[in-house]
Amino acid sequence: MIRLEDVYYTYGTGYAVEGISLEINEGQLVAFVGHNGSGKTTIAKLMAGIIKPVKGSVFIDEMDTKNTKHSNIVRKVGMVFQNPDYQLFESTVLEEVMFALKNMGYEKEKAKEMAIKSLEMFGLSGYAQRPPLSLSGGEKKRLTFAIVYAWDPKYIIFDEPTVGQDRKNLQNLSVMINELIKSGKSVIITSHDMEFLWQFNPLTYVIEKGKVVWSGYMKELFSQTDFSMYNLTEPQLSAISRKLGLKQPALTAEELSEVIKGVGSI
Amino acid sequence: MHVLEVKNLSFTYRGEPKKALDNVSLNLPYGKVMILAGPSGCGKTTLLRAITGLIPKFYEGEYKGEVLIDGKNVLSITQRDLVQSIGYVFQNPENQLVSYIVEREVAFGLENMGFDKDYIINKTENILKELGIYELRNRPLRTLSDGQKQLVAIAGILVMEPKLLILDEPTSTLDPAAAKKVASTVDQIIRNKGISAIIVEHRIDIFSDFADFMAVMEAGKITDFGDIKEVLERYSGDDLRVPAFIDVQKKAYGRVIARKFEDYLSLLNASSKRGKP
């Protein structure tokens, strides 16, 4: 379990995160949503142990991040950054994936085997010998997914994972997230992409100015009459479901089109 | 007359077996906005590099065909003229921000072009106001969010009023409300100033109401080009992030009945009043 207890963080002026307490359980999919600059990424970095709270505590399986070595934290928590350029530095794609594995003590051959498997999963096998920084923006992003997937942490944090991704990559990402959840991992996503998150109906924390202003499942969020106060863009499938008067909103275009077909054309 | 003409352009990066661009041709009339879409790795960035002359100047490989900007071959235009003709906003604002303070960053290009101080101050103030980031003018760039940085990067390019503006996924780091605002603001500014634009976007819905044309790329080739609404309706592939309501219509009715989301919701409203959802 990841547990935040009355956590505060500041970059110098005012609090970027202010008094947040919450728990994330194993096998849960949790989304942090909110505007640019609301504090979502800061919360993600606190949970990944990259930054430490100035007040309060972050516990990862009862380890307080303030007095735990970062190498022990990364075995449990993997974070995929919004900007892939921040985490790519090796000379080839294959070595990039192997880097973290070798640091965790895997033998070179085993690390290579694990890296190759992960590159296959993300359709990057053909790029194994290319320099990471020569890849396109979308490919670099996929590479960062492959890196974290390879080292298999218990908690995986995706910071704005849909940025710069085409439809196929998003479909692959959806499959990956569902598989991770099924295998008992916790997946934490910070995003402003409600259209993407909607299919999962995740446990959602709405963040404004470093505070949690709403929490619950995403379906509930957009079925509230006053959701517009959070300035979040409603997923189109949610809006169409409401227009159709559906008691349970459809989570996918397939589901919704079947409902529409069932009731005849407009 | 076109601001951009790409004629039978092919390019293969040195050492790569496949063509990154394969006989690409397209024209963009003055004052028009085009979305360039296609899956990751299809050649969009390579095409932008060729349009800006970076290919073949800085990337080695086999180059055939030509790119004309404002009627002139991009390879014969001096660097100074090119900078005034084409404005390029990178996908990642970190790649183009060089100053410490927002205001200085936005003024940087104009200072380099040698304009006088009053002109620069006036232009910089106006563009910051037009983009709604005037209150950020004295902030150090490092204190801004990614979204705010992107707006500053856009301001720094728009302030130079290029003939052709290239935006490489300009709103990918912005939340939808901010993205829509940037899209409509950029649209308003470029229409007022008569600037043409090429926008690379995965989230087509953000700019689909503003753009005139759309080009779809796949494996180095242009597979469709034309009026954006028609291209979106024709599109049957699996690569583009088509808006959810378009997807629903195609799946439910086999065609697109309403091209704007609001229109589709109104249709549903009207039909439910007639007793049919």
Regions found by a protein language model. Name each.
Chain A
Residues 33-35:
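The feature captures the beta-strand-to-loop junction immediately N-terminal to the Walker
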Residues 109-127:
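Conserved ABC ATPase "signature" region
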